[in-house]
Amino acid sequence: MATIKEVKEQLAILRDLDDPRWASFEEDSRTGVQAAIRKRRKAILAELAEEERLETLLNYEKSLYARGIELIAGVDEVGRGPLAGPVVAAAVILPKLCKIKGLNDSKKIPKSKHEAIYNQVMKEAVAVGIGIKDNYVIDDVNIYEATKLAMIEAIEKLNPQPEHLLIDAMNLDLPIEQTSIIKGDANSLSIAAASIVAKVTRDKMMADYEQEFPGYAFAKNAGYGTKEHLSGIDKFGVTPIHRRSFEPIKSIIKK
């Protein structure tokens, strides 16, 4: 009789809930085997659900593939709302029908998985472009315009250049066919890829800023107006990376 460890190894091979081999395992009444069966079935169901989710996230891309368009760039930004730091945009072209497990709107991905999924996107992508506009540009032209400039910069860095843009809730003044998608990072795999690239890039920048400007917890809050961040402003004042057109920074520097 196979050991429970050996049974687990054999179960790991199964990918289909209708596989006839399940029957032989189910005849084994050992508690450990029955627990392993339940665990493997649950894992397969999760894998099937993930596959279905990724297929749904490719709906926009598949409609473009059907028209013969293959160089599709997803475009997204991170950092519109913080009181400090830049706005960062990313543009990502993935291979046709590419699926990256766990890829989603970066806000829905556990922080512990950000780096691994970012690395997978960077490995799989046909091209990646990143655009960064600092707080001085944001204060000069406003955050909406700075976001568009960052997106355009990211797209212009792509090589090859895309045939079509899928953009998260934005229209850009570029001679490239584009589709603006509300909540695009949750509805397009290409935009989700751009979302995680922008997120990880900006988080790394804010972690570096924490070393330069300790006391504001930038690595933890990414420049958002948390209690700890506001306490840092009260204690140490406004830094060179704070957005002076944003409240409460705007009022503080007027005092």
Swiss-Prot record:
Source species: Streptococcus thermophilus (strain ATCC BAA-491 / LMD-9)
Q: Which GO terms describe its cellular component?
A: cytoplasm; ribonuclease H2 complex
Where a divalent metal cation is bound, by residue?
Answer: 76-77, 168
Reactions listed under catalytic activity: Endonucleolytic cleavage to 5'-phosphomonoester
Q: Which UniProt keywords apply?
A: Cytoplasm, Endonuclease, Hydrolase, Manganese, Metal-binding, Nuclease
Question: Which cofactors are named for this entry?
Answer: Mn(2+); Mg(2+)
Which gene specifies this protein's sequence? Answer: rnhB
What role is this protein assigned? Endonuclease that specifically degrades the RNA of RNA-DNA hybrids.
The molecule here is called Ribonuclease HII
